[in-house]
């Protein structure tokens, strides 16, 4: 039979809690405005991958701990807003414009597509309490971590491009 493309998350109905990760992948029919249903008051993690109709997401005030977004198939920057303190981990793949996230209590893992431009990563993030990993990046542009001052765990940079972290004091 034929199943139409999902265009919104109304199918979640009155779902109130996801104790694990809500994983949304290959939902090509979803488009803006994209929002977490207001009935969903407990959400430990959100993973979004391969959803070309979704280019921005505001997670402020949702209480989501772990955030994972794969935007690697788009050359546009994904606009992600989250609380100033992210209680869990942050995993990003692609180019992003970030708001909030001054402190991430868990790990941060970032993968980037190839680009020749210089990219500011984590433009607001001052502290990563867990491990910080910048992985697979063959870009010829530079990578800036403009305000990152401390990493609580291991700091792993698997990149070819020059990395600047002018305020980094503690690893």
Where do the PLM segments sit?
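Concave beta-strand-loop units of leucine-rich repeat
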Residues: 1-31, 35-55, 59-82, 86-100, ...
């Amino acid at each position: 039979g034929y199943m139409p493309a999902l265009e919104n998350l109304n199918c979640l109905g009155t779902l109130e809690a996801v104790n694990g990760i809500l994983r949304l992948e290959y939902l090509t029919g979803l488009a803006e405005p994209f929002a977490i249903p207001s009935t969903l008051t407990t959400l430990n993690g959100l993973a979004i991958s391969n959803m070309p109709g979704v280019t921005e997401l505001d997670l402020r005030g949702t209480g989501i701990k772990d955030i994972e977004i794969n935007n690697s198939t788009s050359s546009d920057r994904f606009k992600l807003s989250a609380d100033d303190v992210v209680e869990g981990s942050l995993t990003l793949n692609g180019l992003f414009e970030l708001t909030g996230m001054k402190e991430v209590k868990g790990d941060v893992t970032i993968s980037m597509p190839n680009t020749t431009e210089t990219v500011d990563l984590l433009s607001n993030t001052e502290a990563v309490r867990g491990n910080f990993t910048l992985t697979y990046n063959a870009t010829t542009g530079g990578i800036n971590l403009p305000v990152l001052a401390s990493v609580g765990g291991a700091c792993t940079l698997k990149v070819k491009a020059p990395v600047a972290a002018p305020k980094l004091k503690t690893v």
